[in-house]
Amino acid sequence: MAQAQTQAQAQTRSTESPGTTPPAAKPTPAARLTRPTLTAMVIGSMVGAGVFSLPRHFAEQTGVAGALIAWGIAGAGMLMLALVFRTLALRRPDLDAGVYAYAKAGFGEYLGFFSAFGYWASVCVGNVAYGVLIMSTVGAVWPALGEGDTVVAAALSTVGLWGFFLLIRRGVGEAASINRIVTVAKTVPILVFIVLALCYLDTDVFAANFHGTASTGSLFDQVRGTLPATVFVFLGVEGASVYSRHAQRREDVGRATLLGFLSVLCVFASVTIVSYGIMPMGEIAQLRRPSMAGVLEHAVGTWGGVFVGVGLIISVLGAYLAWTLMAAEVLFVAAQDDDMPRFLRRATADDVPVRALLMTTLLSQAVLVITLFSKDAFTFALGLTSALALIPYLLATAFAVKIAGQRRTRRHSTGDLVVGSLASVYTVFLLVAAGPKFLLLSFIVYAPATVLFMMARREQGRRLFSEGERVVLAVSVAGAGLGVLALTLGWISL
């Protein structure tokens, strides 16, 4: 069924220019996802490993005042991004696979390819971060796992990677149903943490942590230092739009995105702020990951750490499931649109893009091996995940700005333009805040991926690159070369 879409899309490509009239509707896939299920996918994608390490990360960078400002900026910026995905789902319901489809429709096939690959790669690296954190959690009682970066930890994470591959291969609908159940199960421990932390909150400790310490620098530096972590924890806000071709009703995509985002924002901010009332921020900054476990253990005793640890494992497994579903979907649709090689088009009778799923698992496996050579496996995976995802996000927000002025959306153009512009500015700010290290590492990942794009073009008997695409290629290759040079000379490190 999935393969039947290819001919119609290939014919559309020859006549449709970026941002013009939408093509005809595509056949509806077998799985039909309701609004609660789509909302669960958004929440499940965002509530993963990151939230359990927020207390330590924020305490390393800032006090209560800086945290409040950071969440205000992150919340407003990510709200604009969530509204962009909601708007695009309404204005262009013909576009499937969310982030990738928007970049291609707005800026052509090559940048669309980069968006698809970058988003997919960010999910794969993010899944490795999840594995590292699970192993670090269990490492508290099994020292052989260390901080999740030992050979034993990597071996166990490998078993988990391939176990999920087999689960998802059984069917999209079944995996999505499991994700909805897991989303409910993993939210409970986080809410319990917030309630207990409020009960044990010490106002004197909270006041002492309010302005941070001299070592954290100026308030601006404090806030900037926290933002990369907020990018990581909010990755997945586009979850419903990525899986929109499976939605029972297309209008549910935008509603699920907004509802999921607002719910998660409240949870993330609460987890961070209440922790400042339990321990001095210097002690929080020294906690073992997941730092939420250390905070609750300090408040209520040993059982609190165990409780959070169990909650983390459930949470991470659920987020891994949701992210893997989205990653495989993006590769599959890109292959359907002839922007990835044809071998990625294969889907099972249960509508599972099995070869895209296999590629996802293989890349995660490769990154897992690389983390064995990094100084801090979790921080490395977190930073690279965020940097890889920001380019696809920026292209999506730019597309929203582009279509805002088109005649067919004139009635909504002012509001759409404001939202799209604010989301674009916020995304650029995050790219700057990420720093040069992870941007250069991202180029090293992006540039070699062009081989897949060239394979797809050769299969179609087309010229490999247009004039404009050659410019993009030159920039990506130059960035990758600079990144390799920086690694070689020790300017940056893993």
Enumerate the language-model features and the residues they cover.
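Membrane-interface loop-to-helix entry segments
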Residues: 152-203, 257-261, 386-391, 415-422, ...
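C-terminal membrane-solvent junction of multi-pass transporters and transport-like membrane proteins
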Residues: 347-348, 393-479
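Loop-to-transmembrane helix boundary motifs in multi-pass membrane proteins
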Residues: 30, 34-35, 154-158, 248-250, ...
